[in-house]
């Protein structure tokens, strides 16, 4: 990382820098190491922001206004005035989106705050002003791929256009949130640093904070120590903090999951000085998706040791809303929200669950998420697996639990074994097992009306 005292000037190159040594298009991208070790700089306060209604919505059939408002309500219930889910963002281009944003603003919630997203266009800024929204994201692509290939402009022309838009926002009392798209392919020292330095000067003069959202548009960021810019998440955040002197409160990371690194990259951004991580519920977003909001809640819990007064069971309720009302199919093995995320199938694991569910469950998923541990029965379950299914499905406790050596478990196992001898390939359904239990151990059903699912 270069020294902070250096005066970085815009490098208005004639020929774009596409970093072809790192990004040869016909090959897999490369990681270049410089072995520079940067210090961690976890902010005192870290937050989650949401793009479910923006990046999330643009990657699937549009939500209805009713769905947008209901999801917004769920996010508020989940946050529970903890302030962890700090903001969400809306498109303003259609009447439907503007109406939904208006209804959400009328709710009067402190968290999440309603913000917007616009292109680098003053006409778009008028929409923000007319809506009375206090902060807006602004698309400010910063790599030469975008500047030269998409915008067909020079770096100076691009920078001047962006600064003019930010200035216009400040003049209207609107907080700019500058979305530095494709920062993991950008010339950090030749464009990003001089541009952000100018933004910070404007911020001080106006006495209005300007936020910097570092956007890993193609998921090319890597979290490792000693990686060279532009792919280094550590280097980007450290540079914004220490070279550009952007306050942690004004740095946000927005990632994509193209290389499976979106959660780790996001946590790394927190650890090295970004206060906020931009997410979408279930990770729904362009191509491989954004960082899942629910994932960062559990990252927050592990890093900070608590989630304040958040209502984490609302994560389950919101996932069920997406499946039942929006008809979005959540992959069954998705952590924390998939139907099978805490389902055990292996017989040897089921035996452990039978002894103590702590052995094979990540935490008390029933208490925290309203999702009790579940054992699925298959040809590999054995007596332990079947007994564990009975105990977990019917939520039996202490002396009410059924032992794997119970003769009635043998009766169920005989039926299960016969199913697979006959060529069955699917797991045994809960409804099938319920029928068997009602026949061989009806008193179990009488003990409780609760069922795991």
UniProtKB/Swiss-Prot annotation:
It is an enzyme of class 2 (transferase). The keyword Manganese applies. It comes from the Bacteria. InterPro entries: Aldolase_TIM (IPR013785), PYR_CT (IPR000891). Residues 46-316 form the Pyruvate carboxyltransferase domain. The keyword Oxidoreductase does not apply. It catalyses: oxaloacetate + acetyl-CoA + H2O = citrate + CoA + H(+). Gene3D superfamilies: Aldolase class I. It holds the Pfam family HMGL-like. Its EC number is 2.3.3.3. SUPFAM superfamilies: Aldolase (SSF51569). Keywords: Cobalt, Magnesium, Manganese, Transferase. CDD domains: DRE_TIM_Re_CS. Can also use magnesium with lower efficiency. Its cofactor is Mn(2+); Co(2+); Mg(2+). PROSITE patterns: PYR_CT (PS50991). GO terms for molecular function: citrate (Re)-synthase activity. Inhibited by p-chloromercuribenzoate (pCMB), EDTA, Zn(2+) ions, and under aerobic conditions. PANTHER family: HOMOCITRATE SYNTHASE, ISOPROPYLMALATE_HOMOCITRATE_CITRAMALATE SYNTHASE FAMILY PROTEIN. Catalyzes the condensation of the acetyl group of acetyl-CoA with oxaloacetate to form citrate. Belongs to the alpha-IPM synthase/homocitrate synthase family. This is Citrate (Re)-synthase.
